[in-house]
Structure formats: C-alpha cells, structure tokens
C-alpha cells in the first residue's frame, strides 16, 4: 500500500473532523519512508496529533528531517550583531527555549519515544536562520512512500498543535504521479535538499540533534528520583541504554521499556 491507495485531497484545513493532522498527515505518514518538513516555527506539541503516523513511519525504517527557525529575542539579535557571544550558541539557546518548553509538557511515554527517534536517527532536527539573523519562514512538507511516490504540501500551517488543529490554517497538496504537478515537486525537493545540506546561499543551518537528545534526557533525569539521577548532572546515553532503545524499536515500540539514565560520563 502507498500514497496512491489513499484518497488525498488537493487541500486541507486545520479545523473540523477532516483536519490536517487526522485526514492527511497521519494516513500519509503511515505509508511514508521519508518526511521532510521546513517551518518558521516548531513546537514539540505537534507530536500529539500525529504520533500514530510517526510510529508507523519508524516501523517502516523511515526518517524525519525537520528544519525550523528559532524565536530570536531582541537581546539575541543584538548579541549576534555586537558579537557578544558565538552566533551558533545564541541561536541554539534560543531554539532550545521553545524546544524544552514544549517537550516538558509531554508525558514520559511520548518523551521516551521522542528520545528513541532521535537516538536511533529516525528524527533529525536542524535550525535555520538567514545570514542577517532573520527567521526562515517558508512552510514546506515533503513525504515519500515506500514505492517512491512523493506528496508535497505547503501553506500557512507551522509544525505545532495549533497549526494542525486549533488555528484556522490551510495547506495545498500536489502529487508526483500527476503529470502537471511533477515538475513543481522536483523544484521543492531541490529547495529542501539545498536547505538541509547547507548550500542555500541565503540561509544558515545548524545541527540540533545532539542538543535535542541532551535536553530530552535531562528532563527525563529531572523526573527521576534523587537516587537515580541528580537534576544538574550531565546525561548521556550509555551503550546499554542504546541497546535498550534498540530492543524497544525492534519490538515495534511496544512494551514498557525503562531507560536507565547514568550520571556518569561515557
């Protein structure tokens, strides 16, 4: 089964029963092996309405590549312009503020799932800003299924819970197996590839995967008892933790898997 077996419409809105998440993203993610998303704003609350699709994609040995912009404060921009601090550190810290706020609201099961996706390379995140410290504001999504068919969507929706089901947002969808739409899909794929690989001359991207993993593990550690992990200790995945995660993945993301967090350096 692939995208052609789905009743994919030309557009979706974020309201009602047939909203972006329920009627479009979850069904397509379940058939996908690659999900590429670039947005001006990302919140980890987005995982709530599409979690079933993400788990199915992971079972397909799929990958998610996410590019988003940080919400830079006036102080952040001034610090960058005046050279008070390393540009990458300021941008990463700004992105982390929103990232941590969002993931801290997730329950332990979803938080561990997110940690698993990042640790195993299923989910990779990069931060994008313009060379003048402006935000990257394009909103593009690309999905590829197991037979190579591609669906592209674009529109006003950011990658957030509000963007997918609370605000009034609209996306438009094009399909690679429709002759009149195939050329525009190739253009969007090239656009995303340049962004992801850092060859877009107007946008600078920074890796965030390791920072994301560290922030998630720190939150998990903070939720454990004092005897298991102290809140201020640096947290890293040990070999046996990687093995535990791998076993959980191999079991189809089922079962209660307690991931022990060591306070020791590896």
Role assignments for model-derived ranges:
Residues 39, 252-266:
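Walker A/P-loop
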Residues 1-247, 253:
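PLD/PLD-like phosphodiesterase catalytic module centered on the HKD motif
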């Amino acid at each position: 089964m692939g995208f052609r077996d789905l009743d994919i419409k030309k557009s979706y809105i974020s309201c009602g029963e047939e909203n972006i998440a329920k009627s479009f993203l979850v069904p397509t993610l379940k058939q996908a092996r690659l999900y590429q998303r670039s947005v001006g704003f990302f919140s980890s609350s987005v995982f709530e309405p599409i979690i079933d699709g993400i788990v199915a994609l992971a079972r397909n040995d799929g990958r998610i590549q996410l590019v988003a912009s940080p919400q830079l404060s006036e102080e952040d921009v001034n610090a960058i312009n005046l050279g008070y601090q390393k540009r990458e550190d300021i941008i990463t810290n700004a992105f982390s503020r929103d990232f941590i706020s969002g993931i801290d609201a997730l329950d332990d099961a979803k938080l561990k799932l997110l940690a698993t996706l990042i640790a195993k390379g299923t989910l990779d995140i990069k931060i994008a800003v313009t060379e003048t410290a402006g935000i990257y504001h394009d909103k593009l999504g690309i999905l590829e299924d197991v037979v190579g068919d591609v669906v592209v969507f674009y529109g006003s929706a950011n990658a957030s819970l509000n963007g997918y089901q609370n605000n009034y947002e609209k996306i438009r969808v094009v399909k690679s197996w429709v002759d009149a739409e195939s050329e525009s899909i190739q253009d969007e794929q090239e656009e995303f590839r340049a962004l992801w690989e850092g060859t877009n001359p107007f946008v600078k991207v920074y890796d965030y995967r390791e920072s994301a993993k560290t922030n998630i593990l720190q939150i998990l550690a903070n939720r454990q008892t004092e005897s298991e992990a102290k809140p201020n200790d640096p947290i890293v995945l040990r070999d046996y933790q990687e093995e535990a995660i791998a076993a959980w993945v191999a079991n189809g993301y089922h079962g209660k898997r307690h991931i022990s967090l060591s306070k020791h350096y590896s």
